[in-house]
Amino acid sequence: MRVVQDLTMAAPLARARAVAPLVAAAADRIEAGRELPADLLDALHGAAIFRTLLPHACGGDEARLSEHVQVLEAIAVADASTAWCIGQAAGCSMAAAYMAPAAAYRVWGRDPRAVLAWGQAAPGAL
């Protein structure tokens, strides 16, 4: 689902504000399903929300951290869980700037929907 044609050409905060109504509309489904619904993920990827902190070489915005925080805030107003998911992926995205460029490109550069996050699962969750 594309929110606006060529939305990825807009500034990250403008893209976040454009997709925020879709995030808000999905909030009950997110809570009930304990996951981001596929149609919302499509919208977030279409707006390149997960790529805000990625280096340009990997197809990201290479935004300042202050700008990324504004993106998270715009999404969090719509649904805090969605902002949390984006924030989790942001830590890995920032790491791309410190990796060998070829390695970072292999992870994020080939697929515009590539997202990486890590963390420990709750006991018994797997």
What would you call each of these model-derived segments?
Residues 2-6, 19-26:
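Generic N-terminal amphipathic, Lys/Arg-enriched alpha-helix
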Residues 38-46, 51-126:
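Glycine-rich flavin
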Residues 24-34, 81-83:
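A glycine-/small-polar-enriched, mobile loop at the entrance of the PLP active site in fold-type I
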Residues 7, 12-15:
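N-terminal, positively charged, Ser/Thr/Ala/Gly-biased leader segments
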Residues 17-21, 49-51:
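A short alpha-helix capping/helix-coil boundary motif
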Residues 12, 24-27, 56-57:
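A short, structure-level motif marking secondary-structure boundaries and short turns
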Residues 12, 32-33, 64:
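Charged, low-complexity surface patches
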